[in-house]
Amino acid sequence: MATVADHVIAVLKRSGVQRIFGIPGDSLNGLTDAIRRAGDFGWEQVRHEETAAFAAAAEAALRGGLAVCAGSCGPGNLHLINGLFDAQRSRVPVLAIAAHIPLAEVGSDYFQETHPQNLFRECSVYCELVSTPEQAPRILELAMRAAVEENGVAVVVVPGEIFGHRLDETAWGARPVRPTGSVCRPDEQGLRAAAAMLNSAANITILAGAGVAGAHDQVMELAHILAAPIVHALRGKEYIEYDNPYDVGMTGLLGFASGYKAIREADVLLMLGTDFPYQQFYPDRAQIIQVDIRGRNLGRRTPIDLGLLGTVADTVTALQPLLANKNDRSHLERSLKHYRKTRQRLDSLASNDRDRTPIRPEYVAAVANRLASDDAVFTVDVGSPVVWAARYVTMNGRRRLIGSFNHGTMACALPHAIGAQSVDRKRQVVALAGDGGLAMLFGELLTLTQNRLPVKVIVFNNSSLNFVELEMKAAGIVNFGTELDNPDFGAVATALGMFGRRVEHPADLEAALTEAFAHDGPAVVDVVTARQELSIPPAITAEQAKGFSLYAIRTILAGRSDELLDLVTINVARRILN
């Protein structure tokens, strides 16, 4: 007779799950022993449970199916929380198995006791306690169903002793748990209202988010009919940037002036599958149509004139026959011309200054992009690495870009890379890591060596919390508390038995990355980059300009004029502040 843990593994395998990320603990012994006995199911051990949740999120994003992580009772599953928040806000299906103290001890302030159902409620679509062995199969299936249908995190809390209980055969879990296919589009009245607005507008701009996944061709046809430039949010980049003659770049804090301008000049803004959060980048006077699969998102970020509930693919397909071709393509042509100028200016910043040190981070990202494989998976840390990835890593329909783009947590690049590489050890995975982010979960470099994961880690080593410093400058504050006294990360990698290099001169960068990418195991390339590089947003507000002026004055008064000189030398001399 199988145990509860045996049933869990069998159901997961039947539903296409191949591994669980986690760290062993006594309350998980029944589960890990079942994995050992199964023989054909993976246990991906990491060095911190937070990494287990990040890795599961990356696997779910990459495979498009359920991924699983586990944590032992108390502190073990508490460590999962940050990674689970990331998965929940990225809308990827993750099952978290949170082991619990013995059921008889609940409520007694027992060793390592917490209240997992309360703790995980905010970062999940489903969170329930298994109170009896007989209840386990049903709760497991309900949790898996919630995760795959709602694209979110489901948490099953299991007292450790329940894993080892024998279980009679049950119909629960007898069939694979996979997402159901469906068609979702607005009704005819909504479609006709949208068509009327679009047909009467002169200047239409499309803002595309992650919801355009799987709808690339439909959106291209729509843009052609409407003569509409396409601006993308960061999460839409990998799905819409490639093979796109209507692309005018990103908007937002990380975006391009051309994307910002195309939105500001629109009569109608058509939002497709995006929950873009920054209100200051929306147009003041345009009519706005929003298409989203989640009704709660409609009108959440900016007032809208029309909300349409449906998938982007289904909605656009139904809308196209109602639209008239636009003969006036001047808005599109102006936007594309501006984009070409913006793109040329950005590319000029990524040129190789062979004698200038520290190295420009733009150049690092551009070289990594050029040398990486056509189907590479890029994972990026929150902070300045996201800026450089957004601007210089190009998508082609085969590459992937994974990061904490909604939750915004540091230290995600390496754990996400672990999850991505675990799915396919032959696919190139490149982690663009900040020095601060890498240091937070530095022990996971050991996971790369122990699990034989050939992840390539590129460290943007500017010896600071760089993006935090930029925010301080914009607020008119003298940098404080952002200094990082870093080691030679390449030497540390070598000491751990990995390929390690440190690059301090631009002339050495390409050779180091080429060697690292060709290496058959994990590799770390520590690149010393310019600390004072400014990732200027597409539009600077009066308040931000005032902030930079105050920063300059206060920096001089604080006796740190050398910092200001570096800032001016690196940025003003290169004409990116005008």
Task: Tell where the protein language model's regions lie, with residue ranges.
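Thiamine diphosphate
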Residues: 112, 450-543
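N-terminal alpha/beta PP-like core and its mobile active-site loop of ThDP/TPP-dependent enzymes
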Residues: 1-329, 367, 371-374, 454-457, ...
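Phosphate/pyrophosphate-binding active-site segments
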Residues: 134, 157, 169-170, 181, ...
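Active-site diphosphate/adenylate-binding microenvironment
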Residues: 5-15, 26, 31-36, 340-415, ...
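A general structural motif
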Residues: 48, 108-109, 181-193, 252-255, ...
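Glycine/charged-rich beta-loop-alpha catalytic/anionic-binding loops adjacent to active sites
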Residues: 36-43, 61-68, 391-406, 473-476
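Catalytic phosphate/nucleotide-handling subdomain of diverse soluble enzymes
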Residues: 416-456
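Active-site nucleophile and cofactor-binding loops and adjacent substrate-binding regions
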Residues: 23-25, 44-54, 69-75, 131-133, ...
